[in-house]
Structures are given as C-alpha cells and as structure tokens.
Amino acid sequence: MSVRYQLVIDCADPDRLARFWAAALGYELAPPPAGFAAWDDFYRSIGVPEEELTGGADRISDPHGGGPAIWFQVVSDPKAVKNRLHIDIHASGDRTDPIETRKKRVDAEAARLVGLGATLTVVMEQEGLDHYAVGMKDPEGNEFDIN
C-alpha cells in the first residue's frame, strides 16, 4: 500500500520559493482549507504563534493531482551544506530522442528557470555517454537538476 506524502523545504522566504517552484513545476499555489481566507488564518486557528506566520503563500500542489504537495517551512538557520534530497526536473523528453534534441530542451528549461531566479551551477555531460543534465540552485541556494 502506498501512502500520501508531501515534501517540505526549509527556507527563509516561503512565499518567494513557493512562487518559484510553482512556476518551475507547473504547480499552483495551494488554496487554504475550506472556511479560511488565507493559510495564516488556518494556522492561527490551530495555535501557530504569530511570529511563525509568513503572511504569504507557503504551499503548492499539482493541479492534476499526480505529484506531491510541497510545503515551504520557515527556518532561522541559513542553508549551509549540500541538500541530502533534491528535485530532478525531467525536461529532455524520451531517451529515444537524439541527444542534441534533449540537450536543447534541457538548456531551454534551464534558461527559463534562470529567468525565474535560479542559478546554473554545473553542466553534466561526458563524452560518449547518452546523458546530459545541468545542476542548478533555486533562489535560496537549494540544489536541483534538470535532465
């Protein structure tokens, strides 16, 4: 039996990262639970202290229901080391497509995400291998790959 889950990303600015990742993944900002005008209203109702409220978006969801929800949680500690878990965005298409076609797709997606605030950190390509990917960082420095 599978279980439902959500990913949680620690960050300094949940609204900024929620908007970045919603655009990156084709997700939507998740609406607050029924009966609440905003997530902060819901959080207040369950006793979350005012100083922990973000005043903006902090959750995103797949509009088609296939992917996990992602919650962006405020933490006071800055990111210091490489992520132990990261997101891979599959933009290259089918492996039966020519490598040059797949490279163009990956590079186009990387350029789009740079326009949203990401940073390109590394190109992963080895002579003779049928693989091409790029390493990137989101606006707060969390690593992810596009392949």
Model-derived regions, located:
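Vicinal oxygen chelate
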Residues: S2-I9, A23-L25, P32-A34, R44-L53, ...
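Hydrophobic ligand-binding cavity/cleft-lining segments
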Residues: A12-A23
